[in-house]
């Protein structure tokens, strides 16, 4: 067995975020996903002679906003370069990217790490750079998930030329859990900004992981290995954990780690070698002669900075420090901006924050999951949820009744007060209405009454249940318990 504790993992992530602009980065071709292959291409995408790329201004805006949200220093001057390599999914035989003068450098992102049976902590992960580039096309392999072993391959250039932001972290990550949480926080951030949907299944967010191991925090870095083909956050964590253990085992058995690219095999839960890793010199970068330099003034940066929303980390802090929520609930609510906004508007409409949190994270999220809906598809208004919560607090309805009417409120988005009045569901809160029913129950169950008086006090629950059955759950629970105790002990 490997002695994992004597080793330290060193991990960095390269995260590719596909920007959700309507047109591609250097042409007006559509970025629509899921259409027939090769229907969103044009002479610029294909690199035909005589065509010239023109930068999409929205791409620059989205990239700068992402940089500012990640605490990066945005350059006032940057340029595009040609990254040259030959592969079937690259129609021009080069990719327009940024090399030595990226859009932004030297930022950071704070990530909350919560693991079972461990103390939660905040990890500050450095970000080396963010640069803009165009995406490549997509290869479809017949009879295999990769080129090797396939009968033939087809190329779909619909994705080619879609705008990407590549976010390169510093090697500050030390575990698979930290890697997956960092990637998750990147996705959360770009979704809040509205610059990407971050959908890993559709390729809108893709992560490559660079991993090495060393003997303790002061030892020199080991040889790094790049891992690709991780399509979920859990896959990122599992791939990192596997590769860390693999490298340690190789070293402890006297072997050598090669600088290579490996693929994560989800079915077999392991990494396997793909190719030796290229260096940057292999790509023969040089400035793109068809694209001029980009100037981004401080004044323009300030305008875009003021347009940034409140980001997830600030919301989590606010929910815990001001609203009194648990760290877990704060994290669940802040995960989606639509959920966070709904929660805050519910509180703004008079609902107590912890009660609003409970209803949002439990009952509403549960309903949406069971009906395969996203939070952005929720029809219920924050005003109506706040009204229902306040009706519970004022003993107008019971929590049980509230749970029963919630699906109808969600489906129709009608006033809870109006619905309760129409269905006669208001709580019975006066003694004169409850006492006669209790008297009937006592007369009908003399044996249970005597057993209660003889010390079987758990029978109180039996009488409460019978009372709720008679009143269809509308009796005030506190008043019901009080009156039952008085009458059973008399």
From Swiss-Prot:
One GO molecular-function entry: glutaminyl-tRNA synthase (glutamine-hydrolyzing) activity
Catalysed reactions listed for this entry: L-glutamyl-tRNA(Gln) + L-glutamine + ATP + H2O = L-glutaminyl-tRNA(Gln) + L-glutamate + ADP + phosphate + H(+); L-aspartyl-tRNA(Asn) + L-glutamine + ATP + H2O = L-asparaginyl-tRNA(Asn) + L-glutamate + ADP + phosphate + 2 H(+)
Pfam families per UniProt: GatB_N, GatB_Yqey
Keyword Ligase (UniProt): yes
Documented EC number(s): 6.3.5.-
Signal peptide: none
Gene3D superfamilies according to UniProt: 1.10.10.410, GatB domain, N-terminal subdomain
InterPro entries tied to this protein: Asn/Gln-tRNA_amidoTrfase_suB/E, Asn/Gln-tRNA_Trfase_suB/E_cat, Asn/Gln_amidotransferase, Asn/Gln_tRNA_amidoTrase-B-like, GatB, GatB_C_1, GatB_Yqey_C_2, Gln-tRNA_amidoTrfase_suB_CS
A Gene Ontology biological process term: glutaminyl-tRNAGln biosynthesis via transamidation
Keywords noted in UniProt: ATP-binding, Ligase, Nucleotide-binding, Protein biosynthesis
Source domain of life: Bacteria
Family of the protein in this entry: Belongs to the GatB/GatE family. GatB subfamily.
Described purpose of this protein according to its UniProt entry: Allows the formation of correctly charged Asn-tRNA(Asn) or Gln-tRNA(Gln) through the transamidation of misacylated Asp-tRNA(Asn) or Glu-tRNA(Gln) in organisms which lack either or both of asparaginyl-tRNA or glutaminyl-tRNA synthetases. The reaction takes place in the presence of glutamine and ATP through an activated phospho-Asp-tRNA(Asn) or phospho-Glu-tRNA(Gln).
Subunit structure of this chain's protein: Heterotrimer of A, B and C subunits.
NCBIfam families: gatB, PRK05477.1-2, PRK05477.1-4
Record-given protein name: Aspartyl/glutamyl-tRNA(Asn/Gln) amidotransferase subunit B
Organism: Prochlorococcus marinus (strain AS9601)
Organism lineage string: Bacteria, Bacillati, Cyanobacteriota, Cyanophyceae, Synechococcales
């Amino acid at each position: 067995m490997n002695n994992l504790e004597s080793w330290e993992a060193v991990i960095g992530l390269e995260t590719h975020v596909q920007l959700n602009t309507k047109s591609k980065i250097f042409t007006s071709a559509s970025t629509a996903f899921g259409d027939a292959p090769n229907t969103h291409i044009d002479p610029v995408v294909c690199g035909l002679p005589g065509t010239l790329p023109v930068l999409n201004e929205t791409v620059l805006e989205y990239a700068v906003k992402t940089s500012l949200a990640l605490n990066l220093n945005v350059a006032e001057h940057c340029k595009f370069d040609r990254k040259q390599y030959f592969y079937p999914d690259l129609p021009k035989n080069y990719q327009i990217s940024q090399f030595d003068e990226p859009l932004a450098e030297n930022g950071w992102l704070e990530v909350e790490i919560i693991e079972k049976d461990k103390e939660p902590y905040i990890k500050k992960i450095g970000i080396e750079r963010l640069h803009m580039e165009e995406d490549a096309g997509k290869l479809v392999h017949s009879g295999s998930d990769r080129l090797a072993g396939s009968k033939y391959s087809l190329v779909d250039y619909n994705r080619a030329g879609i705008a990407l932001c590549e976010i390169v972290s510093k090697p500050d990550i030390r575990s698979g859990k930290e890697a997956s949480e960092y990637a998750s926080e990147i996705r959360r951030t770009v979704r809040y900004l509205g610059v990407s949907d971050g959908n890993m299944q559709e390729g809108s967010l893709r992560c490559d992981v660079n991993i090495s191991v060393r003997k303790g925090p002061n030892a020199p870095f080991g040889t790094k290995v790049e891992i690709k083909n991780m399509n979920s956050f859990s896959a990122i964590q599992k791939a990192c954990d596997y590769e860390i253990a693999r490298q340690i085992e190789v070293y402890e058995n006297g072997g050598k780690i090669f600088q290579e690219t490996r693929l994560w095999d989800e079915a077999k839960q392991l990494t396997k070698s793909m190719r030796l890793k290229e260096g940057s010199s292999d790509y023969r970068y040089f400035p793109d002669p068809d694209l001029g330099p980009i100037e981004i003034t401080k004044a323009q940066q300030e305008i875009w900075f003021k347009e940034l929303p409140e980001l997830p980390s600030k919301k989590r802090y606010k929910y815990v420090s001001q609203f009194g929520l648990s760290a877990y609930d704060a994290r669940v609510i802040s995960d989606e901006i639509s959920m966070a906004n709904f929660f805050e508007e519910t509180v703004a409409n008079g609902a107590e924050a912890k009660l609003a949190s409970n209803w949002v994270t439990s009952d509403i999220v549960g309903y949406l999951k069971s009906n395969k809906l996203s939070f952005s598809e929720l029809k219920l208004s924050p005003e109506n949820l706040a009204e229902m919560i306040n009706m519970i607090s004022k003993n107008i309805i019971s929590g049980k009744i509230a749970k029963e009417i919630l699906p109808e409120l969600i489906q129709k988005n009608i006033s809870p007060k109006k619905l309760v009045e129409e269905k006669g569901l208001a709580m019975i809160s006066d003694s004169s209405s409850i006492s006669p029913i209790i008297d009937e129950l006592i007369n009908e169950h003399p044996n249970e009454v005597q057993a209660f008086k003889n010390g079987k006090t758990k029978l109180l629950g039996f009488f409460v249940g019978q009372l709720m059955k008679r009143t269809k759950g509308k009796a005030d629970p506190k008043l019901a318990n009080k009156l039952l105790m008085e009458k059973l002990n008399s």
